Amino acid sequence: MAEVEPDVSAAALAKKRTFKKFSFKGVDLDALLDMPTDDLVELFPSRIRRRMSRGLTRKPMALIKKLRKAKLDAPAGEKPEVVRTHLRNMVIMPEMIGSIIGVYNGKTFNQIEIKPEMIGHYLAEFSITYKPVRHGKPGHGATHSSRFIPLK
Protein backbone atom coordinates (compact mmCIF):
# COMPACT_ATOMS: atom_id res chain seq x y z
CA MET A 1 0.00 0.00 0.00
CA ALA A 2 2.94 2.32 0.65
CA GLU A 3 4.18 1.73 -2.90
CA VAL A 4 0.94 2.96 -4.49
CA GLU A 5 0.94 6.39 -2.82
CA PRO A 6 4.24 7.67 -4.33
CA ASP A 7 3.04 6.66 -7.81
CA VAL A 8 -0.17 8.64 -7.36
CA SER A 9 1.65 11.76 -6.14
CA ALA A 10 4.19 11.51 -8.99
CA ALA A 11 1.34 11.22 -11.50
CA ALA A 12 -0.36 14.24 -9.96
CA LEU A 13 2.84 16.30 -10.24
CA ALA A 14 3.41 15.26 -13.84
CA LYS A 15 -0.17 16.04 -14.85
CA LYS A 16 -0.55 19.60 -16.12
CA ARG A 17 -3.38 21.87 -15.03
CA THR A 18 -6.17 21.76 -17.57
CA PHE A 19 -8.84 24.43 -17.73
CA LYS A 20 -12.45 23.83 -18.60
CA LYS A 21 -13.21 25.01 -22.12
CA PHE A 22 -16.08 27.51 -22.16
CA SER A 23 -19.28 26.59 -23.93
CA PHE A 24 -22.64 28.36 -24.05
CA LYS A 25 -25.57 25.92 -24.25
CA GLY A 26 -23.22 23.28 -25.66
CA VAL A 27 -21.61 25.55 -28.30
CA ASP A 28 -17.94 26.47 -27.83
CA LEU A 29 -16.74 30.08 -27.92
CA ASP A 30 -15.11 29.97 -31.38
CA ALA A 31 -18.35 28.68 -32.91
CA LEU A 32 -20.33 31.40 -31.10
CA LEU A 33 -18.12 34.13 -32.57
CA ASP A 34 -18.56 32.76 -36.11
CA MET A 35 -22.28 32.06 -35.72
CA PRO A 36 -24.81 34.29 -37.52
CA THR A 37 -27.05 36.37 -35.24
CA ASP A 38 -30.19 34.44 -36.20
CA ASP A 39 -28.67 31.13 -35.05
CA LEU A 40 -27.20 32.73 -31.93
CA VAL A 41 -30.56 34.16 -30.86
CA GLU A 42 -32.04 30.65 -30.84
CA LEU A 43 -29.68 29.76 -27.96
CA PHE A 44 -30.87 32.63 -25.76
CA PRO A 45 -33.79 32.51 -23.29
CA SER A 46 -37.24 33.57 -24.52
CA ARG A 47 -37.13 37.12 -23.10
CA ILE A 48 -33.91 37.88 -24.98
CA ARG A 49 -35.12 36.08 -28.13
CA ARG A 50 -38.17 38.33 -28.11
CA ARG A 51 -36.03 41.41 -27.62
CA MET A 52 -33.61 40.46 -30.41
CA SER A 53 -36.46 39.59 -32.80
CA ARG A 54 -37.46 43.25 -32.64
CA GLY A 55 -34.00 44.22 -33.84
CA LEU A 56 -31.26 46.45 -32.48
CA THR A 57 -32.03 50.15 -32.66
CA ARG A 58 -29.60 53.02 -33.17
CA LYS A 59 -28.25 53.28 -29.60
CA PRO A 60 -27.19 49.63 -29.12
CA MET A 61 -25.62 49.61 -32.58
CA ALA A 62 -23.67 52.76 -31.70
CA LEU A 63 -22.36 51.01 -28.56
CA ILE A 64 -21.26 47.97 -30.59
CA LYS A 65 -19.48 50.27 -33.09
CA LYS A 66 -17.64 52.02 -30.24
CA LEU A 67 -16.62 48.64 -28.77
CA ARG A 68 -15.29 47.49 -32.16
CA LYS A 69 -13.33 50.74 -32.55
CA ALA A 70 -11.88 50.47 -29.02
CA LYS A 71 -10.73 46.89 -29.73
CA LEU A 72 -9.11 47.89 -33.04
CA ASP A 73 -7.33 50.89 -31.49
CA ALA A 74 -5.94 48.85 -28.58
CA PRO A 75 -2.34 47.64 -28.99
CA ALA A 76 -1.80 43.89 -29.22
CA GLY A 77 -1.85 42.26 -25.78
CA GLU A 78 -3.39 45.33 -24.13
CA LYS A 79 -6.91 45.83 -22.82
CA PRO A 80 -9.13 48.11 -24.92
CA GLU A 81 -10.20 51.58 -23.79
CA VAL A 82 -13.26 51.85 -21.53
CA VAL A 83 -16.49 52.61 -23.40
CA ARG A 84 -19.06 54.38 -21.21
CA THR A 85 -22.78 53.77 -21.65
CA HIS A 86 -26.19 54.28 -20.06
CA LEU A 87 -27.58 51.25 -21.94
CA ARG A 88 -28.18 48.98 -18.97
CA ASN A 89 -30.68 46.94 -20.97
CA MET A 90 -28.14 45.90 -23.62
CA VAL A 91 -27.75 42.13 -23.99
CA ILE A 92 -24.15 40.90 -23.90
CA MET A 93 -23.22 39.28 -27.22
CA PRO A 94 -20.16 37.11 -28.02
CA GLU A 95 -18.67 39.96 -30.07
CA MET A 96 -18.38 42.05 -26.89
CA ILE A 97 -16.08 39.58 -25.07
CA GLY A 98 -12.82 41.18 -23.93
CA SER A 99 -14.22 44.71 -24.00
CA ILE A 100 -14.36 46.97 -20.97
CA ILE A 101 -17.64 48.82 -20.54
CA GLY A 102 -18.47 51.56 -18.05
CA VAL A 103 -22.13 50.95 -17.13
CA TYR A 104 -23.96 53.85 -15.48
CA ASN A 105 -25.72 52.97 -12.23
CA GLY A 106 -27.40 56.35 -11.68
CA LYS A 107 -24.40 57.92 -9.97
CA THR A 108 -21.14 56.54 -11.40
CA PHE A 109 -19.90 54.34 -14.22
CA ASN A 110 -18.97 50.85 -13.00
CA GLN A 111 -16.27 49.27 -15.16
CA ILE A 112 -17.08 45.77 -16.32
CA GLU A 113 -14.73 43.51 -18.26
CA ILE A 114 -16.90 41.29 -20.45
CA LYS A 115 -16.16 37.58 -20.00
CA PRO A 116 -17.61 34.60 -21.90
CA GLU A 117 -19.75 33.58 -18.90
CA MET A 118 -21.69 36.86 -19.26
CA ILE A 119 -23.15 36.06 -22.71
CA GLY A 120 -26.93 36.37 -22.75
CA HIS A 121 -27.12 38.55 -19.63
CA TYR A 122 -27.95 42.25 -19.45
CA LEU A 123 -25.28 44.86 -18.65
CA ALA A 124 -27.43 46.02 -15.71
CA GLU A 125 -26.90 42.69 -13.92
CA PHE A 126 -23.24 43.60 -13.36
CA SER A 127 -23.74 47.22 -12.24
CA ILE A 128 -25.75 47.40 -9.01
CA THR A 129 -27.82 50.58 -8.59
CA TYR A 130 -28.06 50.59 -4.81
CA LYS A 131 -25.76 50.20 -1.85
CA PRO A 132 -26.65 46.96 -0.04
CA VAL A 133 -27.92 47.48 3.51
CA ARG A 134 -25.50 46.57 6.32
CA HIS A 135 -27.71 45.76 9.30
CA GLY A 136 -26.78 45.82 12.94
CA LYS A 137 -24.14 48.55 12.97
CA PRO A 138 -24.56 51.41 15.43
CA GLY A 139 -24.44 54.88 14.01
CA HIS A 140 -26.52 57.31 12.04
CA GLY A 141 -30.12 56.14 11.66
CA ALA A 142 -29.87 53.15 13.99
CA THR A 143 -32.24 53.21 16.96
CA HIS A 144 -30.62 53.67 20.36
CA SER A 145 -27.27 53.67 18.62
CA SER A 146 -25.49 55.50 21.41
CA ARG A 147 -25.97 52.47 23.69
CA PHE A 148 -23.77 50.27 21.56
CA ILE A 149 -20.86 52.61 20.87
CA PRO A 150 -18.00 51.68 23.22
CA LEU A 151 -16.59 54.47 25.41
CA LYS A 152 -12.95 55.39 24.92
From Swiss-Prot:
Pfam families per the UniProt record, alphabetical: Ribosomal_S19
Entries under PROSITE patterns matching the protein: RIBOSOMAL_S19
Main location class: cytoplasm
GO CC term (a single one): cytosolic small ribosomal subunit
Domain of life, per lineage: Eukaryota
Single biological process term from Gene Ontology: translation
Keywords noted in UniProt: Cytoplasm, Ribonucleoprotein, Ribosomal protein
GO MF annotation, one: structural constituent of ribosome
SUPFAM superfamilies: Ribosomal protein S19
Compartment(s) of residence: Cytoplasm
Family: Belongs to the universal ribosomal protein uS19 family.
Protein name as it appears in the record: Small ribosomal subunit protein uS19z
